[in-house]
Amino acid sequence: MVGESFLGPASLAWAKPGDDSGYLSVWQHLVDTRDVASRLWDTFVADSIKQSLATTERLEVSEVRALAVFLAGIHDVGKITRSFQRKIPPGANAEMILGSLEDVGLDLEFGIEEVGAYFPHGLASSVILYDWLLKQGMWGPVAETIASVVESHHGIPARTVDYDRARAILREYPENWLLVQAAVIEAMADATEVKPIIGKIQSELFVPTIQLITGLVIAADWCASNERAFPYVFDCEQEQRVQDGLASIGFAGLWSASKTMKPDVAEYFAAAFGWPDEWDPRPIQQRAFAQARGSDGASLHIIEASTGSGKTEAALAAAHAYAEKHGCHGVVFAAPTMATANGLFNRVIQWAQNVVPAGDTTAAYLAHSMNSLVKEYQRLRVKGVSTDTSGNGSVTAMEWFASPKKGLLSNFAVSTVDQVLMMALQSRHNMLRHLGLAGKVVIIDEVHAYDSFTSAYLESTLKWLAWYEVPVILLSATLPVDKKESLVQAYRSVLGEEDWESVSDGYPLLTIADANGVREESLDIGPNEIHADVSVIGDTDRELLTLCEELLTDGGCALVVCNTVRRAQNSYSMLVKKFPDEVELHHAAFIAHERAVKEGKMLQQLGPVKSADVVYEFFRIVGDRLAGIGSGTGLGVVGH
């Protein structure tokens, strides 16, 4: 047992340099991060994640919690090293801090780590923890997997050669420094009661476990590193400090899906989507909802139905049912383009407002690179403004979540599909993406539209989601059988299931894949099904003009989709002369702001959620392929 007297220097060593008024010590930062991680586990991490981790590692949920909180509490122990402490920026505190360390026997002479060696504090933390775990009797490969969590808390793991060098450096380290490092780990181990749990872990942690615990440690570290929330100088008790800090950050809580669930399908759709009493859910919506409510464990749910059949509402209703059944705390809805994501955002937020319990506050995020141009999302980002109305919960774009790396941690996110597929890549801080997706229901739209390259990433992503026991809902109008079989097999391969072949040629079609097998259910076409006539016309402007005149004589809306921007511009110039004030041009060459304005106007005029004050008797849209994929509008005629 290391003497508690060695904890004193940990309260002198700096973690955050501060200014003349004070600095934050390593010990205080570790205590802050430990306590934040504890709160996040209790109030933010979904029950589905907790149970998945416990089952995977053959531990109790409380034991996984203790391990995660312990690792958060020692993630920066590597800052108690000569090389890090000497990095303190020049200022009024520098001489005082360094002098205090030397006064307690921690010499600051240049060591081997400062002579061309790569020795960042995250790597040092990992090696220090690894050595401590070995002393507890843990097998080396197991200790390496646990230590990798603190090694990666800055987003990327170290190379093996760097790890070996760091071990060599610490083997030659002055004893007093090693004693202080050990004292910090011992104190955190005692505070979290983790030692008996360490003795139970006999095999290496699974990679998904490492990803999620690392994501939690990163989130806790980022919260505790917020100087406004956790000031360097304070005079309150630690519990109050953590409570006030998280409150000032505005961290969202869990979505209590069970509180707003309705057992009757018609009652649910009326409440969740604001439908009038005389509206009935379509058969595909009723069955998708019922199948999700009857699910048992992780499921892949594929909904194949025509455009305009209500797949979006069916998916959201099924997502709510899955969330209630499996303890998920949110929904991610991924669309193929920014335009379709923008169009979905308002619909998802309106649904979320209706399914969040009254008095609760949840976070929302629009996940793509141009979200700053979307007025609906920016409106939610204004602090204190939400869609809260009488009897409904609050859905707000909270400031802490409003960044690319943290956005998917929000309860409700609408994204472009790449934001989900990137979980299959190696990228910095990707653990946060895993943490954000693991506790949710994931909906992916237009899966038939992705090429072979994108589909390969989609299959890898489905494997990750199956590892985390995430319910996944795939939407498609025309999904080829071979692609569906590949997607089903990707998800089920993690569950240890055999290959599967589709046997149904029904349409619309619902497919459920889980550990119990694969079930296909075809449905009768409802009375509101859309039928389309397809014909081929000549490739001249004159024939296009004549066709528009013939088809839209008595009113209606048409979309003319061209293969190139130049062709769209030429067709627009020709049509606008014949139909002034009735033609809009959309294509990818507009600057981002102008494109966002045009897309917003089109969705307001023609989208699923139209302005009641705007009725267009005649309307024509000319655009490139982007307009055809991403319009999300209701049109009577589509030409290509």
Regions found by a protein language model. Give the residues of each.
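Conserved pre-motif I regulatory segment
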Residues: V265-E304
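Accessory nucleic-acid engagement/destabilization modules that flank
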Residues: V2-D20, L24-D264
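Conserved strand-helix element at the start of the C-terminal RecA-like helicase core
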Residues: V331-F333, M338-A341, E550-V576, E584-L585
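Conserved Walker A/P-loop ATP-binding site and its immediately adjacent core
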Residues: H329-Q353, L366-S372, L479-K483, V565
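Conserved interdomain linker/interface between the two RecA-like ATPase lobes of SF2 helicase motors
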Residues: L495-N570
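A substrate-engagement module of RecA-like helicase motors
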Residues: V348-A413, V417-L421
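Post-DEXD/H (motif II) to motif III coupling segment of the RecA-like Helicase ATP-binding lobe
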Residues: L432-V441, H448-E521
